[in-house]
């Protein structure tokens, strides 16, 4: 399966609203494929890892990187435009850096810096492994590899589902 895929899902029963369903997320560790409406494919927030800065980072990032690592600590936000595909239009948003647990590390509790970008307008077709380039005006700030891209609307639905199950 591929994120965004619509055909060949072999779901058996249609969605309650009769609209097509799409692959929203693939979870290889649990062997799950999450499906939902097209609207839930729109990505509002991207988390990048292994950032590379072009020159001196913006002051908010530079100040953050000079501090001692601590889980959950985040930088001040700064305005950016983010570009995910080479020929796609950049999308405006705000970004911050955050210390998060490195889920790919062999050592539990290891921390990594994640670049978190909240987009003003959603993007479609964003997937882990792609590169995200950040700009301020015409200045390239740097790039990072997308570790997670998700829809805040989908998280709201997940929260509703969890609260309803309690």
Model-derived regions, located:
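AMP-forming adenylation/ATP pyrophosphatase catalytic core
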Residues: 1-166
